[in-house]
């Protein structure tokens, strides 16, 4: 059985690091900080005239999905991933993205490669409806290999305080609606690379798998879906109680972040079609089911939590916005967490 830890990623150590960092960050908080470390986005209160608004910020990267871009020498879509990882996070609080900044660090500056990366970032910003206002490109010889780079982003969005989504009103019987992902998105690539032996044999990325209908490389470089515009449409008409972006940590880590302690989510596994890429990963790597749901999005990139009476309207809006979605579970009172059924 192959695990994420076998591939070099220690989730538990990551949790320990966050817990050590929390107290240091809290020492810097002023009275306008209204979320603790660990939320999808960081919320900062603004008083503007008679209204209260919240700035919601987030930062993220693309992870080792970049390795696939290096092997295929294709760099024009990873920027979309970078934007998606950031804007989808702040969307979990109902925030509309305002502006975005990027950070590119490389071993040797290649102007055409950087332009291709930023082309993707700009495309992602257009898809999210935000402005790309700046960034930093750092050339670091001897630190990165000449043909490699790292990519990260930072976004700021805004939401009226009374409309902010924070999960506090989630209750027993509320319904989880899963929004389709475009594929693996930007998490779990260290495990993917291990399962398919990509680092030892990058040529495997050119192999066309019948189950996928395209090459492995094409499948793995599909950009992360940006949910901003369809979900903001839902938020205009529906009281969405909680939103979870399914990223690192999969279902088990991210869904509980969208509701209070003392509740758990029951997920009906057969309620949506798991994309072929995840079945291949599980089969080739002999990865246990729980490990799959702890590492990957399994075809569900975002989860909305709504009251039962709002399900039909939510599904109708998502259909109008051309987003495939399914009712995938319910909220129950009890021990915190997620139960796969």
Curated annotation (Swiss-Prot):
In terms of SUPFAM superfamilies, this protein maps to: PurM C-terminal domain-like, PurM N-terminal domain-like
Its main subcellular localisation, reduced to a broad class, is cytoplasm
Query: What are the UniProt keywords, alphabetically?
Result: ATP-binding, Cytoplasm, Ligase, Nucleotide-binding, Purine biosynthesis
Q: Which reaction does it catalyse?
A: 2-formamido-N(1)-(5-O-phospho-beta-D-ribosyl)acetamidine + ATP = 5-amino-1-(5-phospho-beta-D-ribosyl)imidazole + ADP + phosphate + H(+)
- One GO cellular component term noted in the UniProt record for this chain: cytosol
- What is its subcellular localisation? Cytoplasm
The record, for NCBIfam families, names: purM
Family classification: Belongs to the AIR synthase family.
- Protein name from the UniProt record: Phosphoribosylformylglycinamidine cyclo-ligase
Q: Which organism is it from?
A: Caldicellulosiruptor bescii (strain ATCC BAA-1888 / DSM 6725 / KCTC 15123 / Z-1320) (Anaerocellum thermophilum)
**Name of the encoding gene:** purM
